């Protein structure tokens, strides 16, 4: 479910929730007076009063539609929680009055003082909605058939609840949706109450214009963008025009700001082609055009629009000292200096949201190599900047005078003689782990795509296991299966439960996501409703239409073409968009056939083989020893227990690291045929990233890349697929 921006910004105000069971005193947020305008000490104390609610209430803040078990529903809905929340809300209204406002620290929006209480009441009431027969809708949704009627009473109750929420800036649209559904389904429309909105004001930035342009006959978004040297997106944003740039005004004046050299995006352009044509790095292209998303897969949305190919904010130079370039004396060392950053530094930069090494280098005119030299904790790919930490961005004096800078110089000379050229040591990309070395928890899976390490320095006290699993959309059974050191059930328990207190450790990391699809849960998740008619098949994730079409496109990081393809009822111009309807934005193809270029080296593109490897059942072979006995029940295989994956719930193939699955990492190179099926020819597919040599491993079809470099390593980068690539052991370009 798509979350509203006010939900995301409100996270700052909520404290981390203790992992407790049952109803207890629960804090909605440790709010100090700095976030409350005009509040007395008594008002601050009232707002920070704890309520008698279970910790489930805090989890609903992250996912208002999370599935609750019977005990959780009973604690939340049949105890004193709702009464306690209502009492606190009324107490805050009496104590604080109508003039006190709560300021959202992220968006700057002002809310009435009772905002946190109303927000919590909304979540609790939504989770406690019940049919006329007494069944809770939360329980009904968990078991409802996929073809359940959209006119079921629970759908009606959800729409009714949304239509009278005081959290909305304007409930009129939700009321229209509820009225329409009541009419089409033929059920009696319950009256909805109208509450005064909680939102007092939302800040509206006033653009700072460097000049104004008077609109002429025949002007278009593109013509004005080109003549005034601004990006089309910024022209629309500065003047609050249609973000789809489909309706240009016929008269008036336009604010012109952030001028730059512009490039008109053509059909077929990619970020890589634009960078190559204009001599730009990806960091510069992205920082000068922040509306291009991190994957650069929405560039086609800006065809026939201008983008910036020079800095729209102007070039920044490090201030020069009158006596010498740079800084003569070290700057004061900040309290939040990053680990392993030199203190002999002329200037520090405090990292804020949106910073990356590209923008920092651009701002302070420092090369990436020099930045890494002064801040040795930074990885070569510079993806581990810490938020709110200070890094050195300028040396004291000449950086070449720093010990260890540059190559060592011999103090003697030798006469040049003929010598044999030594081959360059290969860059083995797959061995260079891009994460900090934090040991895995005991028995945690070692073949995961993503691990979680809780950094106490900036994140505070560790969270509960349930919150960690919820943050990655994992059910608890799956989370504990991958991280068994946290599981408190007896080994081989017949009916394990997961309601025990559990907190993750800040000293180890945990598996949160596999590199390939995980087994389908026993109980399929029921699609949301109402959904758009005629949506694409195999949809796995939806968003609800809360905002206008253009805003929804931006939030979901989809192009209009893709959104229309997934949801034909929208029509090509999005004129069929309906608020309150769920639209598809992710399918099985998105999950199973992701583009390696999105996750790999920024400077590489995916290499496809002319003979794709099939992973269907017909292309797999199994050893005679791999019989459906001693079948794995926990997803592990081989080893001392000798468990087989054949006919298991996790997949028929046993990977080299001893886990069951059905995709390439399990059935390809290194697959253990003694404990399940393997792809035909998998014994020749590289299990460890090496190729050729005595073993004559091939890279094609391996998880490391299809190209075999001249040095005998698999990969997909230019070093592997270009000069010296060994065609007999893989694909070459």
Curated annotation (Swiss-Prot):
Topology relative to the lipid bilayer, per the entry, is:
Peripheral membrane protein
Name of encoding gene: LCP1
| Protein name (Swiss-Prot/TrEMBL) | Non-secreted LysM effector LCP1
Family membership = Belongs to the secreted LysM effector family.
**Where is this chain glycosylated?**
298, 304, 340, 350, 381, 432, 442, 455, 538, 630
Q: Which domain of life is it from?
A: Eukaryota
A Gene Ontology molecular function term for this protein is: chitin binding
Task: List the record's Gene Ontology CC terms alphabetically.
Answer: extracellular region; plasma membrane; vacuole
The record's section on Pfam families has:
LysM
Question: Which parts of the sequence belong to the LysM domain?
Answer: 211-256, 261-309, 347-393
Q: What does this protein do?
A: Secreted effector that enables the plant pathogenic fungus to manipulate host defenses for successful infection. Not involved in host recognition and penetration but suppresses host cell death and promotes fumonisin biosynthesis while the pathogen colonizes maize kernels.
Instruction: Cite the SUPFAM superfamilies for this sequence.
Output: LysM domain, Plant lectins/antimicrobial peptides
UniProt comment concerning the protein's domains? The LysM (lysin motif) domains are small globular domains involved in binding chitin in eukaryotes. LCP1 contains 3 LysM domains. The LysM domains play an important role in fumonisin production, while the chitin-binding domains are important for binding chitin.
Q: Does the keyword Signal apply?
A: yes
Positions of the Chitin-binding type-1 domain: 634-680, 688-733
The record's region (Disordered) falls at 605-637
Spell out the Low complexity composition-biased ranges. 605-629
Using the chain's own numbering, where are the disulfide bonds?
637-654, 645-660, 653-667, 671-678, 691-708, 699-714, 707-721, 725-732
